[in-house]
Amino acid sequence: MSTATLEQRAKRGEAPRANDAGHCAHPADGARRGYPRERIDAACDAACRSIAPAWPLDRAIAVNPHWERIGRPVREIAARMAVLADIKVFPPREQIRSAWESARIAPADLRYALQALPAAQAAGMTERNCIDALARPLNLPRLPLLIDVLDDDPLRHERLSWRQAITHQVSQTCAAYFDEHQADWRPHHDQSLYAFWRDTISHDHGIGVLMGLPRLGQSLRALPATRQEAEAWVLERLGLPEAVWPDYLEAVLLTVNGWASWCAYLGWQARLAGESDEHLRDLLAIRLAWGVLLLDCKDDAAARRAFAAVQGHWRDSAALLADAQARLLVDEVWQLAFEAGYQRELAGKLGAVGQPQTIPEAATPAEEIEVQAAFCIDVRSEPLRRAVESIWPAVQTIGFAGFFGLPVAYTPLATSARRPQLPGLLAPSLEVTDAVSGPAGEGGGTMRAAASTARRTRFALSNQASAATRLPGTSFSFVEAAGLGYLGKLRQWLKPSRNPRVRDDLAGLPPRYKAVCRPALVGIDDQAKADLAARILHGMGIARSLAPLVVLVGHASQSANNAHAAALDCGACCGQSGEVNVRVLAQLLNDRATRAGLAQRGIDVPDDTTFVAALHNTTTDEIEGFDVDLLNPIAAARWAKLLSVFGHASDQVRRERAVRVGLDPRMEGGRLLASLRERANDGAQTRPEWGLAGNAAFVIGPRTRSHGAVLDGRCFLHDYDFTQDTDGSLLELLMTAPMLVAHWINWQYHASTCDPAHMGCGNKVLHNVVGGHIGVFEGNSGDLRIGLSKQSLHDGQRWMHEPLRLTVIIDAPGASIERVIDRHPTVRHLIDHGWLHLWRFGETGLLRFSDRQWHPLAMGADPATRQSP
């Protein structure tokens, strides 16, 4: 029977019949007689490509949840998300209204937005239109799915909705299928996800009993055996125009967006390895099949009317999407006005609004620089860099990507726990493991073997304790005998100490080995080491001007009982501490053979130059040095002096941010540090630090462009000197790697703030970890939650993050920047479609890039008083 005939029946309110093509009795036959396979595959693949990946908890990095949608303008995506899934992309109007009424958004900001947005000018939108819109809630209709319109029985208010029930069932199935750590029984992984779900639901009809569907078991017998048959079966039954298939399928995936994002991550990792992965297609088939199962089970007049209504709504989807996009224009104007207020302040701090701009002189002449300190570009580094520079002007601070150019994976001593230490966009190509040696190189293989044996022995006991605490019959006597470490950790959570950060990579090592366990590159020859070192020094901009002491400062956070702890660590290191990277790089650059290779490549490292690895604890703003026992006396003296400077600078930064964490900045320095440590070690503390909340801008240029400016920990800072980059290759790297990482961070915070219900992970207090590391449930049901928790964004009284799109400011000729844009579609989409703002330093002031041209910033003055439009 043709699709047209099925649609005509639906319009008359008739249900599909058992012998219709694709209906229950013969799904395989329906697949053969239905739509061409390539058209089904194209629609399913398009829907799956719309889902951005979500990394597991132990490698948590920030991701723009709309990353796979950047090929369309941001307002179009805002309309699609609203209509397909009730997801908000722009800031809620109540937040904008509050910012307007408090003068956070000034009239000049609104005027600027109306002038800068061509669509607003074309529509003749006025300030009054925009202000009036703030009094009206934005209610955009969502296109219905089968599970929504079939939820119409008289008892629907006394039970879960079908959307909730199906999400729960699919979610629990995924949790069981993907579990690797928590469960003592695991499914066989020779089954596909679809096959596992089909087998599970065929034997467990509990959802039918709970939801009042006694016919579910009968309908399940018609469930197709394979994912491919299920896709065809559902699309035949739906009878929707092919043009709307991708949108309908995307809307279906968005009902289980958390698990879809996990499956997208598995696909991302497979592609990095040159392989393929089908989990996301399986998940789509599962979720699609549920709609048809429900339709079969509710085969009555009401169900037939509901089915016809779905078809009608989706035939009109293009008009609905266009209307939503038009209605969201005012919200796009307010988004830009919100950003303009911050941008004007930023431009003023950089001294570039309406003033002639030339490259400023360095704060300290090169010959007077005694120390170079390279920090991660992370916004939390900015206050510390500023403080260090103010205390000791002979220190030159540098911003560089936090993985320090090392494409490595790290395997701790005596473990198989290999982990990436580089951005999620990349795959590791080098390996790091631990060497064990004293200051004079003593120990070698013998000491390493002894340390490995001791660690494995301790791990064996720890694993027994871990297993005991997971089993229902756990005996306190066993925990008492073998799990004292666990009880100690629990006791510390309940009564937090004021101890400094513990290095987890040393867990299980006896104390005598901890000081001499050092990460090192393996499997790489001297020539490759020299090539790697040369690229990194050129990237940092110090290949021609090395100070006597060069400190490489990674960063890490400190928290207890925090499932999302990795999200506070270094995103460029894939949610890990930057310790491994800086220690390996310092060792590499101090190596005699590497320096000889650098000399052959035209880079002379002075004999008295020493590289030291350090770590910035972003929770307590403490600095820790590594491998300082290897320093010669002169370098050790320089390090001691710098460590004192770091101590004063850290105290300054702690006072600067004390108010944000509810502490008194006037507190005595030791007490303030102790209070921050206590918060960090408190297992009940849901806000150990604010992470990257507030991030809003990225400056790519020499430090002289921002030196002395108080940027409030809101700016990523990456050093770059275009005069030393004659072919533009370094600029291209910066715009296609660090800029994308910063954009991912910025949009994760943006999305989690604008729509915490859909794009955030909810309340930390209610989190339950899924699969040991996959993600979290809020409570014990519902979809896998992705994004940031409410406590990461809100202090209980107000939002600590403003959802502003990233403003990228580059110090480079316009032609050089445009060449990168033209060569990279991803970069072009981000800029042309409004996912970030692009500025550059010009000869007479800042310029903004819009409509493929550079325009003067022309943001106007910020009036002292509000004028009614």
UniProtKB/Swiss-Prot annotation:
Keyword Phosphoprotein: no
GO cellular component: plasma membrane
Record keyword Metal-binding present: yes
Assigned keywords, A-Z: Cell inner membrane, Cell membrane, Membrane, Metal-binding, Transport, Zinc
Biased composition (Basic and acidic residues): 8-17
Binding site for Zn(2+): 376, 378, 555, 570
Membrane-topology annotation of the record: Peripheral membrane protein
Entries under InterPro entries matching the protein: DabA
Disordered: region residues: 1-32
Subcellular location: Cell inner membrane
Cofactor field: Zn(2+)
Domain of life: Bacteria
Pfam families: DabA
GO function term, MF aspect, one: zinc ion binding
Role description: Part of an energy-coupled inorganic carbon pump.
Family per record: Belongs to the inorganic carbon transporter (TC 9.A.2) DabA family.
UniProt cross-references to PANTHER family, sorted A to Z: INORGANIC CARBON TRANSPORTER SUBUNIT DABA-RELATED, UPF0753 PROTEIN AQ_863
Assembly description: Forms a complex with DabB.
Database matches in HAMAP family: DabA
Name under which the protein is recorded: Probable inorganic carbon transporter subunit DabA
Organism for this UniProt entry: Burkholderia multivorans (strain ATCC 17616 / 249)
Gene assigned in the entry: dabA
